[in-house]
């Protein structure tokens, strides 16, 4: 967690359909959600490297739904938004690997706590 400060992002318990959005400004986050909620994790890129899809997920507490390139569209590199669904109680570590070809450039590790 060299760059990371832990950030607890909590979602309202009554809003199980609400989307929990995690912005790209903080890396290595901890997110708390309820079963049924969707989680959007946004990661920015500088240069031609991109985050690998799907990312590595440590447990079945969440499922990977997909990834999209989202605004802002900059010449520096794409902004990627990864979408997940909280499917059962538990804790899942998500390991994002930023690759340039076969070379590892950077990693981000986020944790999702599903209540």
Protein language model annotation of sequence segments:
Residues 40-46:
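Short edge beta-strand/loop segments characteristic of extracellular beta-sandwich folds
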Residues 84-94:
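Glycine-centered tight-turn and secondary-structure capping sites
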Residues 29, 80-82:
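Short strand-edge motifs at loop-to-beta-strand transitions and within beta-strands
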Residues 48-72:
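Short, solvent-exposed loop/linker segments at beta-strand-coil boundaries, enriched for Pro/Gly
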Residues 95-107:
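Short, exposed beta-strand-loop hairpins at the edges of beta-sheets
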Residues 11-13:
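C-terminal motif of bacterial Sec signal peptides marking the signal peptidase cleavage site
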Residues 15-39:
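N-terminal edge beta-strand
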Residues 107-113:
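C-terminal edge beta-strand
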């Amino acid at each position: 967690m060299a760059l990371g400060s832990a950030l607890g992002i909590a979602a309202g318990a009554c809003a199980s359909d609400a989307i929990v959005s995690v912005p790209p400004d903080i890396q290595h986050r901890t997110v708390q959600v309820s079963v049924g909620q969707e989680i959007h994790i946004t990661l920015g890129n500088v240069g031609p490297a991109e985050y690998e899809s799907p990312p590595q997920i440590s447990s079945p507490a969440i499922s990977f739904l997909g990834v999209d390139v989202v605004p802002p569209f900059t010449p520096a590199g794409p902004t990627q938004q990864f979408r997940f669904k909280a499917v059962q109680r538990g804790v899942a570590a998500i390991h994002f690997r930023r690759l340039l070809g076969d070379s590892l450039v950077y990693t981000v590790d986020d944790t999702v706590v599903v209540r």
